[in-house]
Amino acid sequence: MKLNISFPATGCQKLIEVEDERKLRTFYEKRMATEVAADPLGDEWKGYVVRISGGNDKQGFPMKQGVLTHGRVRLLLSKGHSCYRPRRTGERKRKSVRGCIVDANLSVLNLVIVRKGEKDIPGLTDNTVPRRLGPKRASRIRKLFNLSKEDDVRQYVVRKPLAKEGKKPRTKAPKIQRLVTPRVLQHKRRRIALKKQRTQKNKEEASEYAKLLAKRSKEAKEKRQEQIAKRRRLSSLRASTSKSESSQK
């Protein structure tokens, strides 16, 4: 089995192949996200603690968190699920995934170093890979440089050097996202004002409609009462004429 080990503190990653089954037994029957002591891997791993972050079986099917089995299952996956990327909006697909419990049928097991041990691992903890890009979001820049809300974030942006032969060296800065500027606040005020205007307009229209409805219902009621009174007058007139005719006979 191969072990794909990463160390986030240095940004390094190393793939090692372990032939001895006894060294791997410490990982068997463990679930994803479990922290395991890496001492059985060798003397250089003494004191190291690693977290199981995933893996793939011999056919390439990935492990999925929350599927409590050793084997493979077919799940109906949609947007937001791990092990699946939808190609269309709202698309769902039944995919084969492996359970989150480690066993001997895996070809690669992904591990993340949680605690460093006594010795350095060559190519993993002795070297540091600098990040290619700095943070882009305003809140993350503040967090990186421990800035307050009053500080100007734009002065602390990590710039990327662009070196070209025969040209003056220059740097490139990313566009800061979620930066609160006077223009953003103005847009927010305008949105709130427009919303208030819409609410007021809807209220006025609703009250006008209610008045019109009341007026129409009142008119309809008066008209109905007039018709009833007219019918009564006609019926009484007919009754009186029939009485007079009968008396003459």
From Swiss-Prot:
InterPro entries: Ribosomal_eS6, Ribosomal_eS6-like, Ribosomal_eS6_CS. SMART domains: Ribosomal_S6e. Residues 236-249 have a biased composition (Low complexity). The gene is rps6. GO terms for biological process: cytoplasmic translation; ribosomal small subunit biogenesis. Pfam families: Ribosomal_S6e (PF01092). This is Small ribosomal subunit protein eS6. One of its GO terms (molecular function) is structural constituent of ribosome.
